[in-house]
């Protein structure tokens, strides 16, 4: 998919990783093979709750091991955050994380797939599966953070948005500050997307670069080119001190 997490592993001096192939780098240490899976000697059922990348991968591995798998997703399509993020500028190829796994699961006779299935605890327990895998993801927080990356205060203003709100189309206002404490690709591409949609966007981050960790994936120059092309103002080594719903204080 071109995410370059593999080359980032080399830059970081850690074992190689791969978004598409979870066994990469673990062939010898854990004996994992990308295509050969040890069949279970105790056939049983598995319920996977959540159809994002992790849930799809868990269902696929369990099915290849010989389990009877049911995977349930609350939304009307598979893919979770990777499906949403693939709609951002330059991210379309990331959809293949979802596409391959959905296709592979659809070819297997021991897999049942259900969308629009919001399961609560009672429904999960009453389903009667021998094994349950919870892959329901997480939500972005609305908080102020210290320089040590510790949340110090909530930002409970209606004008405070997270990436989840961006994906859901809930962002309002014409002049927006994107405060990036994640430091990877998402803050930059969200700022780019909002600018493309006609917003006046300022990007701020405590790091020394916009989307600083993309240095590891060899993408940092492209981040700056995209933000400059869309007229996004960039402020690095800048922290968000407060926001009262009208004015943001940065320093």
Predicted regions: what is each one?
Residues 95-141, 155-156, 164-165, 171-172, ...:
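A Rossmann-like FAD-binding core segment of flavoenzymes
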């Amino acid at each position: 998919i071109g995410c370059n997490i593999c080359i980032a592993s080399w830059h970081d001096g850690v074992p190689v990783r791969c978004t598409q192939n979870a066994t990469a780098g673990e062939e010898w240490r854990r004996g994992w093979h990308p295509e050969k899976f040890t069949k279970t000697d105790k056939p049983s059922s598995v319920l996977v709750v959540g159809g994002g990348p992790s849930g799809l991968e868990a269902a696929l591995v369990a099915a290849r091991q010989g389990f009877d798998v049911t995977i349930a997703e609350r939304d009307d399509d598979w893919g979770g955050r990777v499906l949403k993020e693939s709609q951002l500028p330059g991210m379309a190829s990331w959809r293949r994380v979802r596409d391959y796994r959905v296709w592979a699961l659809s070819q297997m006779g021991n897999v049942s797939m259900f969308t629009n299935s919001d399961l609560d605890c009672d429904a999960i327990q009453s389903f009667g599966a021998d094994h349950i895998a919870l892959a329901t993801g997480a939500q972005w927080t609305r908080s102020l953070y210290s320089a040590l990356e510790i949340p110090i205060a909530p930002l409970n203003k209606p004008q405070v948005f997270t990436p989840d709100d961006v994906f859901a189309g809930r962002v309002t206002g014409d002049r927006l500050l994107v405060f990036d404490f994640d430091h990877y690709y998402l803050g930059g591409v969200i700022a780019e997307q909002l600018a493309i949609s006609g917003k006046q966007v300022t990007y701020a981050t405590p790091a020394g670069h916009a989307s600083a960790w993309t240095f590891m994936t060899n993408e940092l120059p492209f981040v700056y080119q995209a933000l400059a092309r869309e007229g996004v103002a960039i402020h690095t080594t800048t922290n968000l001190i407060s926001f009262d719903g009208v004015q943001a204080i940065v320093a």
